[in-house]
From Swiss-Prot:
Protein name per the record: ATP-dependent dethiobiotin synthetase BioD
HAMAP family documented for this protein: BioD (MF_00336)
Subcellular location: Cytoplasm
Cytoplasm is among the record's keywords: yes
Pfam family, one: AAA_26
KW Transferase (keyword) present: no
Gene: bioD
A biological-process GO annotation: biotin biosynthetic process
């Protein structure tokens, strides 16, 4: 049976892809059959007339997985916007059944799967007759989550709102990771302390350098549960 964890965040561009790549890379370095999946990606880049899932490409390159990144994303859109708007712009219906089927295939390929979300935890994936929110995907795939937050001023509010939303939706939170953490910044240091105290969760930090991430292999393995 495969194991998985879902990487969500307090918003866009706080480091979900970087953290996903870091986890997959560390597992791969230990000889573990680890892989990646993302249900919907917007902001795909056109290269030689073909759209490329850049987030997936980054993760696969960083973790040295020599595969086509597009094979690990169910829906890829060119418009850099929320998936629901990108799908509407390209007249595409996003189906939960495809996401589930694609994830089943990924599970058969890898022993450990890191699943990256889109935007923040309250992200509309598809608005239509059968609307899909990001939380619906997390529940459907039966995954625990890691919340990635920025370390800057204001992160206490955004992080705790994300924590409370997940709890209200009965989603299990494995940990919080503060990204772009500066161990010499008094605000960053206090943010970690306060978030840990308020959330009662384990709070890890990652700096701009991979070596500055304080997450051990044992901790990483504990993030993943049977799926």
């Amino acid at each position: 049976m495969s194991k998985g964890v879902f990487i969500t965040a307090t918003g866009t561009d706080v480091g979900k892809t970087y953290i996903s790549a870091l986890l997959v890379k560390k597992l791969k370095q230990q000889g573990i059959n680890a892989g990646y999946y993302k249900a919907a990606l917007s902001g795909g880049v056109m290269i030689d007339g073909n759209i490329v899932a850049k987030d997936a490409e980054y993760v696969l390159k960083m973790s040295k997985i020599d595969k086509n990144p597009n094979d690990y994303v169910s829906y890829i859109f060119k418009l850099s916007a929320s998936p629901h708007l990108a799908a509407q712009f390209e007249n595409t219906e996003i189906l939960m059944s495809k996401i589930v089927n694609d994830f089943e295939g990924i599970k058969n390929e890898f022993d450990y799967v890191t699943i990256e979300g889109s935007g923040g935890i309250i992200c509309p994936i598809f608005i239509g007759e059968k609307p899909i929110m990001l939380i619906d995907i997390i529940k459907q795939l039966n995954l625990d989550i890691i919340i990635v937050s920025n370390s800057e001023l204001g992160t206490i509010n955004s992080t705790m709102l994300t924590v409370e939303y997940a709890k209200q939706n009965h989603i299990n939170i494995k940990a919080i990771i503060l990204n772009n953490f500066d161990s010499n910044n008094i605000i960053h240091i206090d943010n970690k302390r306060v978030i840990k105290e308020l959330s009662r969760l384990t709070v890890y930090t990652c700096g701009t350098n991979v070596k500055d991430c304080e997450i051990s292999l044992e901790d990483i393995l504990n993030f993943y549960t049977d799926v």
